[in-house]
């Protein structure tokens, strides 16, 4: 549990931020800049309006800083809102409904439908409307918080200067006390394979296909690969994912959960070729694509033919033409911007957060860094425990985890205990006829402290936040087990798993 000294410290910091906010000058009332000869003066200039950038800009303005946010695209929100998290979740949700209606699921619930048809155009329209509403929402929040928005490509042209260049070549200069780089990431290209966003697509193109592929090959069975692959598999495509690693779900996933996840996806019709590498891809005259693969350890090559090839081998930091070289800021071997614990680069008033720095490329991680970074600019404490940052795969069932996996605990030599509870024994999952998966809790053997939580099943993405809170506050498995959970709810499975971890036995299993 949180100590009283930590509570007092937190309250003191809040008071410190309030005093700073009242002491600073008011922010600009101009929500959108047009291009002019007169430079803008700012306290904080944020380059990029993705989850990290726009949240940091709003927080900076709320703390009393005169804040500018530069965005090269017409809409705010970055990759996440425009061609990432948000549109993909719309398609994941709606394709799941279609799959339930088109298969035997609805019939088993007493819902009989004579004909179920897919209107892909309408599904894409709903996705686009969700994106439009949310990106417009950020613009409204900027106006509400008096964040000055500048359209253009931001480049750092001096220690205290950023120049935004518009598509027509016109420029705007911002003289600023602090600069925050939040330019995000871009799709990692596959050597020898050219993405045309038509038949050879990245995650961006996979969100806007004009028709359901007959056969789709996905290079990579990590988070993005299985999410987008499952969308098109549910809508009727024959989908095969080729993965260099020996498991699905990417780095960080617990291996027991990964095996269960693969089994469930295969039961749904998703195919996998693990421990397999892609050698190349060739477009044929009939429009199809031959994908050459072989075992990761080497061996005889095999060819898989598809009409759509989806490349999902990860993302890389986007730092092109930011002016870093001229400032003497060198990137690390993975193309990331080195920063200290306060997110400062080697130039103290130039900061970087999100996908351009080390750590998982997650929207919520970038948001946290953005808030804490600008609080640091205002003189506050800066601390993030990356062990408490959750990860979610938004398939059905969902997969989510936070903290350590069994593999990590074994590698670190930490003695631990395990508590599990299957959704098949959860009353709400039973009534919903959605019982695949389990909750798995890892606790420290000597102290009972929660070290990790791994969930596969309905509502995993929502439930994992309870685990993140427990980790952040240093809760024990018993602490969670003694919290009364509403009945009947899926989250009772989380309590039961903690009962199993702390006392050696769950109640309902």
UniProtKB/Swiss-Prot annotation:
Q: Which InterPro entries match?
A: Class-I_Pyr_Nuc-Dis_Oxidored (IPR050151), FAD/NAD-bd_sf (IPR036188), FAD/NAD-binding_dom (IPR023753), FAD/NAD-linked_Rdtase_dimer_sf (IPR016156), Lipoamide_DH (IPR006258), Pyr_nuc-diS_OxRdtase (IPR001100), Pyr_nucl-diS_OxRdtase_dimer (IPR004099), Pyr_OxRdtase_I_AS (IPR012999)
Protein keywords: Acetylation, Cell projection, Cilium, Cytoplasmic vesicle, Disulfide bond, FAD, Flagellum, Flavoprotein, Mitochondrion, NAD, Nucleus, Oxidoreductase, Phosphoprotein, Redox-active center, Transit peptide
Which positions bear N6-succinyllysine? Answer: 66, 104, 122, 132, 143, 159, 166, 273, 277, 410, 430, 505
Where does this protein hold NAD(+)?
A: 220-227, 243, 278, 314
Cofactor(s) recorded for this entry are: FAD
N6-acetyllysine modification sites are: 66, 104, 122, 132, 143, 346, 410, 417, 420, 505
Determine if Acyltransferase is one of this entry's keywords. no
Sorted alphabetically, which Gene3D superfamilies does this protein's record hold?
3.30.390.30, FAD/NAD(P)-binding domain
Q: Where does this polypeptide localize?
A: Mitochondrion matrix; Nucleus; Cell projection, Cilium, Flagellum; Cytoplasmic vesicle, Secretory vesicle, Acrosome
* Assembly with partners or alone: Homodimer. Part of the multimeric pyruvate dehydrogenase complex that contains multiple copies of pyruvate dehydrogenase (subunits PDHA (PDHA1 or PDHA2) and PDHB, E1), dihydrolipoamide acetyltransferase (DLAT, E2) and lipoamide dehydrogenase (DLD, E3). These subunits are bound to an inner core composed of about 48 DLAT and 12 PDHX molecules (by non covalent bonds). The 2-oxoglutarate dehydrogenase complex is composed of OGDH (2-oxoglutarate dehydrogenase; E1), DLST (dihydrolipoamide succinyltransferase; E2), DLD (dihydrolipoamide dehydrogenase; E3) and the assembly factor KGD4.
Free-text function comment from the UniProt entry = Lipoamide dehydrogenase is a component of the glycine cleavage system as well as an E3 component of three alpha-ketoacid dehydrogenase complexes (pyruvate-, alpha-ketoglutarate-, and branched-chain amino acid-dehydrogenase complex). The 2-oxoglutarate dehydrogenase complex is mainly active in the mitochondrion. A fraction of the 2-oxoglutarate dehydrogenase complex also localizes in the nucleus and is required for lysine succinylation of histones: associates with KAT2A on chromatin and provides succinyl-CoA to histone succinyltransferase KAT2A.
Any idea what this protein is called? Dihydrolipoyl dehydrogenase, mitochondrial
Organism, per UniProt? Sus scrofa (Pig)
């Amino acid at each position: 549990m949180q100590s009283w000294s930590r509570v007092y410290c937190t309250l003191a910091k809040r008071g410190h931020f309030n005093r700073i906010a009242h002491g600073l000058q008011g922010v600009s009332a101009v929500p959108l800049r047009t291009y002019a000869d007169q430079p803008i003066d700012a306290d904080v200039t944020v380059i990029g309006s993705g989850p990290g950038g726009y949240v940091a800009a709003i927080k900076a303005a709320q703390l009393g800083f005169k804040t500018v946010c530069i965005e090269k695209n017409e809409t705010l929100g970055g990759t996440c809102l425009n061609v990432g998290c948000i549109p993909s979740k719309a398609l994941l949700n709606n394709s799941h409904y279609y799959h339930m209606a088109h298969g035997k699921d609805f019939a088993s619930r007493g819902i009989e439908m004579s004909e179920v048809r897919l209107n892909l155009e309408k599904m894409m329209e709903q996705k686009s409307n969700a994106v439009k509403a949310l990106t417009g929402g950020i613009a409204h929040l900027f106006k509400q918080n008096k964040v000055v928005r500048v359209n253009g490509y931001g480049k750092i042209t001096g220690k205290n200067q950023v120049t935004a260049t518009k598509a027509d070549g016109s420029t705007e200069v911002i003289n600023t006390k602090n600069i925050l780089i939040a330019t995000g990431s871009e799709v990692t290209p596959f050597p020898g394979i050219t993405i045309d966003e038509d038949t050879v697509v990245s995650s961006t193109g996979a969100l806007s296909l004009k028709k359901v592929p007959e056969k789709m090959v996905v290079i990579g069975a990590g988070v993005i690969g299985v999410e987008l692959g499952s969308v098109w598999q549910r809508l009727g495509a024959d989908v095969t994912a080729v993965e260099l690693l020996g498991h699905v779900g990417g780095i960080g996933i617990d291996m027991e959960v990964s095996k269960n996840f693969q089994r469930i996806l295969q039961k749904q019709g998703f195919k996998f070729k693990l421990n397999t590498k892609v050698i190349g891809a060739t477009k044929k005259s009939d429009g199809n694509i031959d994908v050459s693969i072989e075992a990761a350890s080497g061996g005889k090559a095999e060819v898989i033919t598809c009409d759509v090839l989806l490349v999902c081998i990860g993302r890389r930091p986007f730092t092109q033409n930011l002016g870093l070289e001229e400032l003497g800021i060198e990137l690390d071997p993975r193309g990331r911007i080195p920063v200290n614990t306060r997110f400062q680069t080697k130039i103290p008033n130039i900061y970087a957060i999100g996908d351009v720095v080390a750590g998982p490329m997650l929207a919520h991680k970038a948001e946290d860094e953005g808030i804490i970074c600008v609080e640091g600019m205002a003189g506050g404490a800066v601390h993030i425990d990356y062990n408490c940052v959750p990860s979610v795969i938004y398939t059905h069932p969902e997969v989510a985890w936070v903290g350590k996996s069994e593999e990590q605990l074994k590698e670190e030599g930490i003695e631990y205990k395990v508590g599990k509870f299957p959704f098949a024994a959860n009353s709400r999952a039973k009534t919903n006829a959605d019982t695949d998966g389990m909750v798995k809790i890892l606790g420290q053997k000597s102290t009972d402290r929660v070290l990790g939580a791994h969930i596969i099943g309905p509502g995993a993405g929502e439930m994992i936040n309870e685990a993140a809170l427990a980790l952040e506050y240093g809760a024990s498995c018993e602490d969670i087990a003694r919290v009364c959970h509403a009945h009947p709810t899926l989250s009772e499975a989380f309590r039961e798993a903690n009962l199993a971890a702390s006392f050696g036995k769950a109640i309902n299993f």
